[in-house]
A protein has these predicted regions:
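Conserved anion/nucleotide-ligand pocket segment
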Residues: 170-233
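Internal helical hairpin/lid segments
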Residues: 239-294
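C-terminal motif of bacterial Sec signal peptides marking the signal peptidase cleavage site
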Residues: 20-23
Length: 375
């Protein structure tokens, strides 16, 4: 592979008299800055929301489980440090039935509040857990498409990504207040920030023993396996299209339940519509079978389809959760020496070497709590 020249990509933003430096992070995080080259634009059927600029408003909402207001306020401070203006949903901070961040009506109301305010340019969810499936029938695809803006989150927020994709709007599978509140200076946070500002990652991944080689292009769908599979057949089901690149991650699930969910996708014809598969983190998942890993088990299932499989993408509930643009046209290239994931959308392309990115280890118990699988 040719050596690429390293550039320091920086954009100077001035907001409220403060000059800020925004970039795709730094070389220590394993990020290389090549000369920007225009990429093939997104297909007309999928709208890419406008990238953010200094002073733009970002709404913080809680569509699933509640998040302590302390975390929300710390996240707001992080956003201010990025030169953005945070606004907090009217119902954020409420607790219903011991877990939910408000009633169904209140959580839907906060989504509509954020979507309907033209001054809000992005929406960051505070936490996953459980609850977005309760909102599916209370939202319409038309209202999501009427005001396209970046929706950010993962885990239970996979349901909202499915709704956004079905509405024809791209969204970001990325970190939330439960993580941003730690300071927002790690690679997981800064790459998500940079993506919101128009710096699009092009991921270079190391070789993985369970990879299946090949190249494929399609629309990126998926997320947390046990969240999006129950949405099959609903208006939040983004797997109904063709030419899919399926992303899957999980936390705290047994191997047999992961197999069950994948079999459901198989029986519903989803895997037949996939051009490729990306396997993310399977954090704290079971090892009750003799495969050795979840990836090894899924390799055996997916090898029958003759499609490329990219294993080990650091996205999901692991120690690193790198951002993905859901609903975007992407290309994966899986080779013997590694793999590449590229988003075919406009923006400044930034090469990210995932093997060089490190983060503070999140204890397994903390990951399970954030996923809503433990108290």
């Amino acid at each position: 592979m040719k050596q690429k020249r390293i550039w320091t990509l920086a954009a100077t933003l001035t907001f409220a008299g403060l000059t800020m430096l925004t970039s795709c992070s730094n070389e220590d995080n394993g990020i290389v800055y090549p000369t920007p080259t225009p990429e093939k634009p997104a297909e007309p059927s999928q709208v890419k929301p406008d990238y953010l600029k200094a002073g733009d408003k970002v709404a913080l909402i809680s569509p699933s489980y509640y998040t302590p207001m302390e975390n929300v306020e710390k996240t707001a401070e992080v956003l201010r440090g990025w030169g953005l203006e945070p606004v907090i949903g009217p119902n954020v901070g409420k607790v219903v039935d011991g877990r939910y961040a408000g009633t169904v009506a209140e959580r839907v109301s906060d989504i509509r509040w954020a979507m309907g305010d033209p001054s809000v340019k992005a929406i960051i969810c505070n936490r996953g857990g459980y609850g977005t499936i309760q909102l599916i029938d209370h939202l319409s695809l038309a209202e999501l498409k009427a005001s396209p803006k970046w929706l950010v989150g993962f885990s239970d927020i996979s349901t909202l990504h499915g709704l956004a994709t079905r509405a024809g709007v791209m969204s970001i599978h990325g970190t939330m207040s439960s993580f941003l509140a730690k300071g927002g200076t790690d690679a997981t946070s800064t790459l998500m920030r940079d993506l919101l500002l128009g710096n699009v990652p092009r991921y270079e991944l190391p070789a993985h023993e369970q990879n299946i080689e090949g190249q494929a292009s399609g629309v990126l769908v998926g997320g947390n396996l046990c969240t999006f599979v129950p949405n099959l057949g609903s208006q939040a089901d983004a797997t109904q299209g063709n030419d899919l690149i399926l992303f899957v991650e999980e936390v705290g699930e047994s191997m047999h339940n992961i197999d069950r969910q994948m079999r459901i996708l198989q029986m519903n014809g989803v895997l037949n519509r996939c051009k490729g598969v990306i396997l993310g983190e399977f954090a704290d998942c079971g090892t009750e079978f003799t495969y050795g890993s979840v990836e090894a088990m899924l390799h055996e299932m997916l090898k029958e389809y003759g499609i490329p499989v990219l294993c080990g993408f650091p996205g999901g509930h692991g120690d690193v959760n790198l951002p993905l643009v859901m609903g975007a046209p992407v290309t994966i290239d899986v080779r013997a020496d590694g793999a590449t994931l590229q988003f075919n959308i406009d923006g400044t392309q930034c090469e990210v070497r995932t093997a060089d990115i490190t983060a503070t280890v999140t204890p397994a118990a903390a990951r399970m709590v954030m996923a809503g699988k433990h108290e």
